[in-house]
Structures are given as structure tokens and as C-alpha cells.
């Protein structure tokens, strides 16, 4: 028999120290906490006011205790054979505590892993139970009973158990002996309470610690242990829950409950244990009690070990543990008679005590703590069950009541919920009801009143931790283990989860328990939204918690079953969603463990679950990769609609379990946009109709997407690169893509594409001009985006316009192109070209609008023939530009080197002239530029020229400024043209040279020409169709420009008139440039292999200048790509023959023209300097553009370069 030596201690002894002790204060018993022992480690839960206890029960208890003492080896007269000496006891206690703490720490570490937690809890419970003295030792050590003179903490557990009157017997180890038995001091213990010093023989009892020996021996000890949660069996977590409470090995609350429970009866320990109330904290356990009760926190196992070890101590230990509610046959009777033994609090019907149920509300609080603790052990939510909630009436529930309480599906319908008195007509209504607030509240109240506290409010019933720990008052004990008394609490938990009280989700243990025994690993999902729920939605609910092995989606009944790979995963899922209801399309779902299936044997017809899940995962991965690639809200590079997750954003919680279960990406991370695409890709058919989705995107996005996004789609691969640029400024992206196109075209003989485009450009020329005029204004704002901060600063007035125009153009282009692609490429080309001319989207449109050139360049990069064909196709259908863009993108990177391969490195300069149209004087310059073509071959230089030409007037001014500011200009140029940025260093030197040279030459026209040439060269190198398109749009003006430009440029070199001309003609040039471009395209076609072509390109350079203005934007994006390859010599015009070949931009001499113009002009340094220079020109050009008529003194500064270029 287990002697529960409850020492009735004066209320005072415990004092405030009690909270620190591990001894649990039984909620029912009110009394000052016993003083904390030296080893007291954990604060006791605050004692609840003791229910009034009939005095009659106390004598009975005393008598029982006396009997137990007589029988118990630890009887008052005899020493506890297990206790050798206070020192050894202390040592044992310390060791036990240390071991327990370690185990607990391990348990905490695995809290999120229900399987591991369960195993660990079992081990812990076994360890605790296996040590007869462990609980005892632990109690004093944990509780640190201060009474023991030896310093052994006498955990006078103030067990104000609800079950125990304030006079509840406190088991105190002999304080002097440092008896392992914690003294549960029930400070308010009535004086008449029979105080039996548990170790009177062994250790003198402190007068303050009168020990009342409860005859717990029968079943008490074990039950007490069980009270502590059939720790080893089902509630190891709960047992530790007390630890979570702060008691090393016990759930403080449970300990309290156990104490109270134990106190309540002779077998209160066992009773407490059963109830999981074994709320006598460790204190509670007298030496005897500790042995079995030490389990206080450790259920069955302790009892088992206690049996052997403390068999003498606990006569009914095994049976008690096994029969938590009965606390063993002996205790069971006692417990059942508990009301008689212990007068239940006036409010509590002890006579109705159910061994499975907590002894009393007060005890249940401890028990509740226990449940909470176990929950903590498992779910760290043990505290959820409030002690108040934990306090449940002792009244047992009827079987049907338990079923309703647990939320089990009724056997017959319609069914009236015995808890809520609500009639339900079908299972769906029942599930809704069970998960509803009304039922949860009723269950909570009922559990409090009926002592079902152990039943965790597993709204699903699945999560009920109670199942795990009978301590939870496993209503299942009543239901499943009707005779829980015989069964250990562990058994009870079978359906403990059935409890729907959300308050008691010791779900993990209960859930595991319940599910393992019942539902298995299948989760039942109800209330799915009608018609809008897909398989992916359902699967996504489970993926965060682990692998989903199978599922059934019953759309007709709006329910689904998910089979998880592991029971723990299913339980975790249910528990989580009970706490945070899942939502699909804004509708809450009812998720619980399935009582119908333990596992899904049937396979999804037609669709392989693994395949669907794999699709979901793969899409998530893709989304993750794309998101990583994405910068900002831009669309994924891939056109594939699959860029987005197949399934809608997961509704499942982002809980830590997601990472733990790692069955896939966090569905909660999925985007809403992903979810939008889901309907098309639902059922895992993400691959289905990607083209359709793409078409859909193309149809709708052109209006919705930014110009950047449109370009991205239109240009495909180019869009990929440009995304990064786009994110910052769409203009640069386009220009970048244009630049790429130029490079490709440059390599690819874009002249053919341009020739093809000439008609288009001509067609587009008229509207294009008007647009160009408008967009010329808009381009200025654009330039800041394309051009870097320097450009933005210097060119802000103009740049601002340009970016806006470019954006609108590009947006229109992309939209128009897509529409046209869907409808006709011709319309798109027109708009695109107009946009190019206007927004200087020459590059983009070279890529997009004049896909012929762009495609040719892009695809031509892949193959020269495809280039031409693509150019034609692009011209015919801009929509082709997208695919071309995709192909082009990868090829473009590789093809940058194609200039060398094509052998037109310095020659191929098919410019995208759309933007040059703005500046008519540039056309003249362009003519001159063809002469300078070889120099212009430096595409970057041409691009820069474009930018400046775009700026028009600004170019002239920029030139003037450049001569004084060359170093500064170089940076600004680099700003406008990132390529130049690469060449900043050299550019500074070159600028220094240029300053003198420009000053000497004083040819602002040359400067503008040079820039134009550069622009042309850049575009020529790019050989974009955009210029071609522009040329086509306005072939005549282009011709005129070509004619005018070359002479005019020459003249300009001699004089600064071109500067004025470009400034004045910037709108005119825009218009004329298309024509010039058309002619130039023809020329470029011829001259692609020649410098002559470069010259023709130069004649287009005004447009190119605009394009370049954009290009500066693109150049930044290209800078890493193009400059890294540096396959295209740019700014060749800056290389001037002197004693050697001198680069004005970089200030470097080369003995060989090839080394200077080919190698050097491809160098990063040269590119950077050219960028800087063009940026400066662009800035100046913007300023001049604002004052269109203002000639460019700066151009005169740039002139020297242009002259040298001409030379």
C-alpha cells in the first residue's frame, strides 16, 4: 500500500515559499503553501480556495490513513525501508531530479515532434515510475520541502485540492529526516485532521508538519502517480506537464491536482493519479506515496516500477496505476467512496466521482494543469487548459454524453447533442456543431462540472490530450475504458481527443492517442467551399505538416479526407487548424481526425496523389526560384503560366510545423497571384494549356503589366535580363534589350531586318513622328530611368519625359504588340515603332516592334538566317518577338561575341533609329557618321550619341559642356550609358584629352556627330530592327537625314550648326529619322559588313541617339553583360590617329588601329568612359532639349571627339 503521508502542516509553515516548491497545491485545498525546501525548484500553482469539506470525511480519511500506515512499510512507527538516510535520500533526489530535468529538456526539444515527444514521455514516465524513491526524492528536491531539518525539501505541498478541504492532509516527508516524501502541507488542514508523520519512525516530524497518513496505500500511490498523468502510459507529456509547470518531474498543476486528488481519498494518490489530478505535487507523496506517487507526474510506469520497488509501500500500486480512476482496486473503492472519505467541496459531487474523472474541480485544476502540462510536454499547450477548466466535477458522463463531449460522430441520426441539447440531422451538421463555439463552450462548462477536464477540447476530439493522459480525465476512460479504473490512464486516452473543448487540446498526446487508436492518420476536412475547392487546396492544407500520402475529395458533400504519412502529422494538422481554422476562399474549414478511416486504401482515380503533390512541390520550387529571380512585382521570366504555383496560396498555417514536416514549400508563402492562376491549373494540371495561360497573360497583361513586364514577355529572354533593369526603370530595360538587339543585329546583319522593316517604319513613320514628338517630351523623363543617377540628375527634365514616354510607349507597344500578336503583328509594329520613335524605345522596339531586326538579332544570334527570317516574322508579327526574345535572350548573351564571329565587329552598325527621328540635324550628322562609320562602329559610342541625339539640343550643349566638363561629362555619360561607366577611368583621361581636343576643334557638331555616330554605331552593332522599323516608318526622312546627316555631320564637325539643327529638329528628326533609318537600313544591310553600313547607321544615328538615350538606360543593365563580353567595340570614333591611335575617352595610345578600335573599344574601361561621356552629353542634351534652340557649346566640346572619330 502506498502511504500517502500527508502532513497537515500549519498554513503558516509553507508561507509564500510554497509556490517555489514543486509540491502542487491542489486547487481544492486552500492553505498557506508549505515552506519551500532547500531543493524546492518549482513554484506551485496558486492554491484554489478549498471547497468546504465535511468533517465526517476527514476522520474517515484519518482512519484510512492510519490503516494504511499500519500496513505500510512506512507506517508511522516504521522507517520506510526504501529510505536509507536523509543524505542518501537527498542525493538520490538530486540525481533523480537531474535525470528528470535532462529528460525534460530533451522532451522540450522534441516538443514539436509528437512522435518523439511521445516516446520520450514514455521513457520519462518509465524512468520516474521505475524509481520507487524517485518521485519521493524528486518531490522533496523539487519541492524543496523546507521542513526537513536535513535540508531535504519537505515538499509540504499545500494541496488545497478542490477535493481536499483546506485541512487536506499534506504528506510531508519527515522534515528532519529529509524524508524523500514531500510533505504536502495542507496549511489549512483542520487541526482535528489526523496528522500521521509518514516517517515518524524514520524522521522526526517538524511540529509544524503534522503528517496525516492517508491510506493511500491501497491504490493511492499508484493512482497518484497516475494522477500525474498516466505519465508513462498515455500522458508522459502530461506528466512532464507539471514540469512545464515548473516542477522538474511533475506537472505542478497536475501535481497539485494529484495532491488534492490524492488527499481526497485514502487512495487519493491513485485517484489523483487517475484523474491526472495526482495533484499532490511531489510534496504530496509521502515516502510511500512518493514511491508510487513520486510518479505524481509519472503515471503508470511509475506505478509499475513502484510496484516492484515500492511494492511494500504501495500495495495497490500496480492496480492503482493501471486503474488510474480506480487507483487500483483498493483505491478504486476508496476513491469511489471518495466523497465519503473526503468530503468533496460543497460544490463538488464527489459521490459521483469517476475514477477516470478528476477527483474534483479543484483537483481537476491540478489535473487541468496536468493536462496542460502534458500538453506542454507534447504541444507546449498544456497550459491552455486553465486550471479552472481543469477543475471538473467528479461526476462521470454517460457513454453517449462522452461521445458528444468528444465530438464523436453519432451512431444514429438525427442526433441530439447531450451536451448542447441541439439536434443535428446529418454528419455535416454534427461536425459543424462539434466545431462550433456553442459546443466548445458547453463542453468546457460540462467538463468543469462533470470532471471531464481531462478531455482536452479537441474540437476535433482528435487533439484531446486527455486521451494521452488519463490525467486529462480521459473521458475516453469512461467511454473507451469504461472501467478506466482497471486500465491505466494511458488506456483512457483512446478517445480523449474526442473532447471538443478547444481549451484542452493536449491535442498532441490526446490526438496522437486518439488518432492512433481511432482515426489513424487520416484527417477529415469538412465545410469545403462549394465548387471552388480543388485538390490542390486540400492537399496544401496538409503539406505544411508533413507528407500527404493520399486524399479523397468529395465535392458533392464538400468534404475531403487527407491521409498523412504519419499519425503525428495528422494530429498536428488537426490541432493546428483547431486553433487556427483553415480558410479556403474565405470559408472556414472543419478539420478533425477521421473516425471513418484510419488510412485511405483507395487511390485517387485517374490522378496520382504523388504526382499531384509533386507538381505542387515543383511549382512551389519554381515559384521560389522565380521569386528569387524576380525583382519587385514583375512577372516571372518564364512565359509559362506555371511560373505561378498550381494551387492557390495555401490556407494552412505557417506554423513551425511546416518547416518540421517539410513536405514542400510553405504553402502559406504562395502568392495570391499564384492562387489566381490556380483555376486554370487546378488538379495539378499545371502543365495544362500553358500556352493558353500565356496567351491569357499576354491578352490581359499588356494592359495590366508595366512596360517592363510587357517587354519582358515580348522579348522573352531579354525580359529576363531586363527584369532587373525593369524593376528600376522600364526604359533602361527596353534600351538594354534594344542594345542587346543591336548587338545581335550588329552581329547578325540586321540591315536585312531593317530593310524588311523599312516599309513598316514608313507606315509607322507618320503616326510615329507625332508620337515621337510627344514621346520625345516623355523620353526626357525616361532617360533618368534608363540613364543612371547621373543622367537622371543632369537629364532629369528631359529624362523624366523620356522614361514616361518610354513607359507609355513600351506599355502601349507591349500591349499593342501582344494584341497584334494575337491579332496582327503589323499593328503592333506600328504602335511599337511609333512608341520607339516617341519614347526612344527604339531599342525595345528594335527588339519588340521590329522583331524582324530584334528577332533577327536575337534569333539571328542563334543563326543568321533565322535572324532575317525572324526579322521578317517580327515585322509581320510582333508577337513573334516574344518567342524570339526568349530564344534571343540566351543567344544574345552568347551572340554578343558574334560581332567577332560575323567579322563585322567594327562594321556592323545597324542602328535602331526610331529615336533619332526626333533630331533631324542628327540625320545630317548621320550622313557624316556613315563616313565615320568605322569609328561609329563602337556601338556604345553610337548609343551614347543616340542618347545625346535624343536629347537633341542637349547634345549640342552637352558637347560644349563636355569640352569644359569632359571628366564630369564622362561620368554623366556613363550615367546615361552604363557601358561608359565601365570606361569611367579611361573616360576621365580621355575627357581630359577631349577637353583640349574639343576646345581646339571647337566642333560642337562633331561632338554631336560623334555621339550620333556612337549612337549609330551602338545601334549598328545592335543592328536592331527598331531603328529599322523607324527607318521603314520614315524611310524618306531617313534618307534625307542620311544625306543631310553625313554632310551635315561633316559640317557640324567643322561647325556647331548640327547642334542647333538637332536641337531645333528634335521633333523633326524624330519624324525624319524613320525615313533616314529606312534608307539607312538599306545602307546598313549593305554596310553591315562594312564601315559603310556603319555610316548608314550613322546617318540614322540621330534616331540611334534617341535610342541610345534609352540605351544609357539599357547600358547599365548591359554593362555587366555586354561589358563582360565586350565583344562589340563601342566609341570607336574616339580613337583618333596620332603618333599612334589615341583614345580620347581613355587617354590611351595604341600602335595598332585594330588594337585601339577593336580591342580597346571593347574594353570595360573604354565602355565606362564612353558611358560617362554619353551621360554627360545626355545631361547636357536634356538641358539643351529643354531649351531646344540653345546650341551646344558643349557639343563643340564634344566636337573634337567627333572630329577625331571622323578622322
UniProtKB/Swiss-Prot annotation:
Effect in UniProt of substituting residue 643 to A: No effect; does not affect ability to regulate alternative splicing
One GO molecular-function annotation for this sequence? mRNA binding
Annotated RRM domain ranges read: 521-596
Post-translational modification remark: Phosphorylation regulates the subcellular localization. Phosphorylation of Ser-638 and Ser-640 in the RS (arginine/serine-rich) region promotes nuclear localization of the protein. In contrast, phosphorylation of the C-terminal disordered region promotes localization to cytoplasmic ribonucleoprotein granules.
State the source organism's domain of life.
Eukaryota
Positions modified as Phosphoserine?
Answer: 638, 640, 643, 645, 652, 729, 789, 853, 864, 879, 881, 963, 999, 1034, 1046, 1057, 1066, 1078, 1096, 1101, 1190, 1192
Phenotype caused by lack of the gene: Heterozygous or homozygous adults display left ventricular dilatation. Left ventricular diastolic diameters are significantly larger, although there is no differences in the systolic ventricular dimensions or contractility indices. Subendocardial fibrosis increases with age and was accompanied by electrical abnormalities, such as widening of the QRS complex, atrioventricular conduction delay and a predisposition to arrhythmia. Rats are at risk of sudden death caused by heart failure.
* One GO BP annotation of this record: regulation of mRNA splicing, via spliceosome
Function description:
RNA-binding protein that acts as a regulator of mRNA splicing of a subset of genes encoding key structural proteins involved in cardiac development, such as TTN (Titin), CACNA1C, CAMK2D or PDLIM5/ENH. Acts as a repressor of mRNA splicing: specifically binds the 5'UCUU-3' motif that is predominantly found within intronic sequences of pre-mRNAs, leading to the exclusion of specific exons in target transcripts. RBM20-mediated exon skipping is hormone-dependent and is essential for TTN isoform transition in both cardiac and skeletal muscles.
Q: Give the protein's recorded name.
A: RNA-binding protein 20
Tell me which species this is from.
Rattus norvegicus
Name the lineage: Eukaryota, Metazoa, Chordata, Craniata, Vertebrata
- Primary gene name: Rbm20
Amino acid at each position: 500500500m502506498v502511504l500517502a503521508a500527508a502532513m497537515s502542516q500549519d498554513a503558516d509553515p509553507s508561507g509564500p515559499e510554497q509556490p517555489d516548491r514543486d509540491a502542487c497545491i491542489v486547487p481544492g485545498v486552500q492553505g498557506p503553501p508549505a515552506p519551500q525546501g532547500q531543493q524546492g525548484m518549482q513554484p506551485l500553482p496558486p492554491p484554489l480556495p478549498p471547497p468546504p469539506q465535511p468533517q465526517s470525511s476527514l476522520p474517515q480519511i484519518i482512519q484510512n490513513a492510519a490503516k494504511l500506515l499500519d500496513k505500510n512499510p512506512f507506517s508511522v512507527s516504521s522507517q520506510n525501508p526504501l529510505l536509507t538516510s536523509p543524505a542518501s535520500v537527498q542525493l538520490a533526489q538530486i540525481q533523480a531530479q537531474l535525470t528528470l530535468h535532462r529528460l525534460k529538456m530533451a522532451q522540450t526539444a522534441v516538443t514539436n515532434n509528437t512522435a518523439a515527444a511521445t516516446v520520450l514521455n514514455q521513457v520519462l514516465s518509465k524512468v520516474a515510475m521505475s524509481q520507487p524513491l524517485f518521485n519521493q526524492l524528486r518531490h522533496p528536491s523539487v519541492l524543496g520541502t523546507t521542513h526537513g531539518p536535513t535540508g531535504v525539501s519537505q515538499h509540504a505541498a499545500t494541496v488545497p485540492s478542490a477535493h481536499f478541504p483546506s485541512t487536506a492532509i499534506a504528506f510531508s516527508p519527515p522534515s528532519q529526516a529529509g524524508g524523500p516524501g514531500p510533505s504536502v502541507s495542507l496549511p489549512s488542514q483542520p487541526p482535528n485532521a489526523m496528522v500521521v508523520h509518514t516517517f515518524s519512525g524514520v524522521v522526526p516530524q517538524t511540529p509544524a508538519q503534522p503528517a496525516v497518513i492517508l491510506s493511500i496505500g491501497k491504490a493511492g500511490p499508484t493512482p497518484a502517480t497516475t494522477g500525474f498523468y498516466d505519465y508513462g502510459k498515455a500522458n508522459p507529456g502530461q506528466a512532464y506537464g507539471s514540469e512545464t509547470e515548473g516542477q522538474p518531474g511533475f506537472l505542478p498543476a497536475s501535481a497539485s491536482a494529484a495532491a488534492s486528488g490524492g488527499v481526497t481519498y485514502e487512495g487519493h494518490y491513485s485517484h489523483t493519479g487517475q484523474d491526472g489530478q495526482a495533484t499532490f505535487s511531489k510534496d504530496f507523496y509521502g515516502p510511500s506515496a512518493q514511491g508510487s506517487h513520486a510518479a505524481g507526474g509519472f503515471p503508470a510506469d511509475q506505478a509499475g516500477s513502484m510496484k516492484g520497488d515500492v511494492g511494500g509501500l504501495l500495495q495497490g500500486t500496480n492496480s492503482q496505476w493501471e486503474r488510474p480512476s480506480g487507483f487500483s482496486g483498493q483505491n478504486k473503492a476508496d476513491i469511489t467512496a471518495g466523497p465519503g472519505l473526503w468530503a468533496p467541496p460543497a460544490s463538488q459531487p464527489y459521490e459521483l466521482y469517476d475514477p477516470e474523472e478528476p477527483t474534483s474541480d479543484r483537483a481537476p485544476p491540478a489535473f487541468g494543469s496536468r493536462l496542460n502540462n502534458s500538453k506542454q510536454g507534447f504541444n507546449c499547450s498544456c497550459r491552455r487548459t486553465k486550471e479552472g477548466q481543469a477543475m471538473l466535477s467528479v461526476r462521470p458522463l454517460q457513454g453517449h454524453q462522452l461521445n458528444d463531449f468528444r465530438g464523436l460522430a453519432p451512431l444514429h441520426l438525427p442526433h441530439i447533442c447531450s451536451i448542447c441539447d441541439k439536434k443535428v440531422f446529418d454528419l455535416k451538421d454534427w461536425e459543424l456543431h462539434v466545431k462550433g463555439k456553442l459546443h466548445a463552450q458547453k463542453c468546457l462548462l460540462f467538463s468543469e462540472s462533470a470532471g471531464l477536464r481531462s478531455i482536452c477540447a479537441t474540437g476535433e476530439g482528435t487533439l484531446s490530450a486527455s486521451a494521452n493522459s488519463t490525467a486529462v480525465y480521459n473521458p475516453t476512460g469512461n467511454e473507451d475504458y469504461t472501467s478506466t479504473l482497471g486500465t491505466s490512464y494511458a488506456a483512457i486516452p483512446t478517445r480523449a481527443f474526442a473532447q471538443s473543448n478547444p481549451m484542452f487540446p493536449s491535442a498532441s498526446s490526446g490526438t496522437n492517442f486518439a488518432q492512433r487508436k481511432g482515426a489513424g492518420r487520416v484527417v477529415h476536412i469538412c465545410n469545403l467551399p462549394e465548387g471552388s475547392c480543388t485538390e490542390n487546396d486540400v492537399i496544401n492544407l496538409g503539406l505544411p505538416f508533413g507528407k500527404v500520402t493520399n486524399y479523397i475529395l468529395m465535392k458533392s458533400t464538400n468534404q475531403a479526407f487527407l491521409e498523412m504519412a504519419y499519425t503525428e502529422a495528422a494530429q498536428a494538422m488537426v490541432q493546428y487548424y483547431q486553433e487556427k481554422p483553415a480558410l479556403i476562399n474565405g470559408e472556414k474549414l472543419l478539420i478533425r481526425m477521421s473516425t471513418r478511416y484510419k488510412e485511405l486504401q483507395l487511390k485517387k482515380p485517374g490522378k496520382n496523389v504523388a504526382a499531384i503533390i509533386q507538381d505542387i512541390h515543383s511549382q512551389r520550387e519554381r515559384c521560389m526560384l522565380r521569386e528569387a529571380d524576380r525583382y519587385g512585382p514583375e512577372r516571372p521570366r518564364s512565359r509559362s503560366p506555371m511560373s505561378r504555383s498550381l494551387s492557390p496560396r495555401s490556407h494552412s498555417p505557417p506554423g513551425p510545423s511546416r518547416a518540421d514536416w517539410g513536405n514542400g514549400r510553405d504553402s502559406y508563402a504562395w502568392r495570391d497571384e499564384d492562387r489566381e492562376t490556380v483555376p486554370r491549373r487546378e488538379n495539378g494540371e499545371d502543365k495544362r494549356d500553358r500556352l493558353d495561360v500565356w496567351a491569357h497573360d499576354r491578352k490581359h497583361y499588356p494592359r495590366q503589366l508595366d512596360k517592363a513586364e510587357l517587354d519582358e514577355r515580348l522579348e522573352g529572354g531579354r525580359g529576363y535580363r531586363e527584369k532587373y533593369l525593369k524593376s528600376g526603370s522600364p526604359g533602361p530595360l527596353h534600351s538594354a534589350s534594344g542594345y542587346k538587339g543591336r548587338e545581335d543585329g550588329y552581329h547578325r546583319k540586321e540591315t536585312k531586318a531593317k530593310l524588311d522593316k523599312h516599309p513598316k517604319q514608313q507606315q509607322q513613320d507618320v503616326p510615329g513622328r507625332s508620337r515621337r514628338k510627344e514621346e520625345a517630351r516623355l523620353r526626357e523623363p525616361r532617360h533618368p530611368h534608363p540613364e543612371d543617377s547621373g543622367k537622371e540628375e543632369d537629364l532629369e527634365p528631359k529624362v523624366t519625359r523620356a522614361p514616361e514616354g518610354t513607359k507609355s510607349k513600351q506599355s502601349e507597344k507591349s500591349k499593342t504588340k501582344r494584341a497584334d500578336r494575337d491579332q496582327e503583328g503589323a499593328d503592333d509594329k506600328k504602335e511599337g515603332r511609333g512608341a520607339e520613335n516617341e519614347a526612344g524605345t527604339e531599342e525595345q522596339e528594335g527588339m519588340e516592334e521590329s522583331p524582324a531586326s530584334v528577332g533577327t538579332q536575337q534569333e539571328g544570334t542563334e543563326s543568321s538566317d533565322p535572324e532575317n527570317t525572324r526579322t521578317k516574322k517580327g515585322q509581320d508579327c510582333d508577337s513573334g518577338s516574344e518567342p524570339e526574345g526568349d530564344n534571343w535572350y540566351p543567344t544574345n548573351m552568347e551572340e554578343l561575341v558574334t560581332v567577332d564571329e560575323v567579322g563585322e565587329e567594327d562594321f556592323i552598325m545597324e542602328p535602331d533609329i526610331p529615336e533619332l527621328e526626333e533630331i533631324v540635324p542628327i540625320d545630317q550628322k548621320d550622313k557624316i557618321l556613315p563616313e565615320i562609320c568605322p569609328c561609329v562602329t563602337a556601338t556604345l559610342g553610337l548609343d551614347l550619341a543616340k542618347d545625346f541625339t535624343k536629347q537633341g539640343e542637349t547634345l549640342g550643349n552637352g558637347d560644349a559642356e563636355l569640352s569644359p566638363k569632359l571628366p564630369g561629362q564622362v561620368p554623366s555619360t556613363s550615367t546615361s550609358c552604363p557601358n561608359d561607366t565601365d570606361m569611367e577611368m579611361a573616360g576621365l583621361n580621355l575627357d581630359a584629352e577631349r577637353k583640349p581636343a574639343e576646345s581646339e576643334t571647337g566642333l560642337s557638331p562633331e561632338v554631336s556627330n560623334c555621339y550620333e555616330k556612337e549612337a549609330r554605331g551602338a545601334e549598328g552593332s545592335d543592328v536592331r530592327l527598331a531603328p529599322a522599323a523607324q527607318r521603314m516608318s520614315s524611310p524618306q526622312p531617313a534618307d534625307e537625314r542620311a544625306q543631310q546627316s553625313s554632310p551635315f555631320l561633316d559640317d557640324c564637325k567643322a561647325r556647331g550648326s548640327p547642334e542647333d539643327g538637332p536641337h531645333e529638329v528634335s521633333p523633326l528628326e524624330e519624324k525624319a529619322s524613320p525615313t533616314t533609318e529606312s534608307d539607312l537600313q538599306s545602307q546598313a544591310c549593305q554596310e553591315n559588313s562594312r564601315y559603310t553600313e556603319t555610316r548608314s547607321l550613322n546617318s540614322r544615328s540621330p534616331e540611334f541617339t534617341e535610342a541610345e538615350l534609352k540605351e544609357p538606360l539599357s547600358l547599365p543593365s548591359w554593362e555587366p553583360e555586354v561589358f563582360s563580353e565586350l565583344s562589340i567595340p563601342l566609341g570607336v570614333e574616339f580613337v583618333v590617329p596620332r603618333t599612334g591611335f589615341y583614345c580620347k575617352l581613355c587617354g590611351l595610345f595604341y600602335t595598332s588601329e585594330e588594337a585601339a578600335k577593336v580591342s580597346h573599344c571593347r574594353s570595360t574601361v573604354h565602355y565606362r568612359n564612353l558611358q560617362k561621356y554619353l551621360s554627360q552629353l545626355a545631361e547636357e542634351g536634356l538641358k539643351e532639349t529643354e531649351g531646344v534652340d540653345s546650341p551646344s557649346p558643349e557639343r563643340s566640346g564634344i566636337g573634337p571627339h567627333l572630329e577625331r572619330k571622323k578622322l
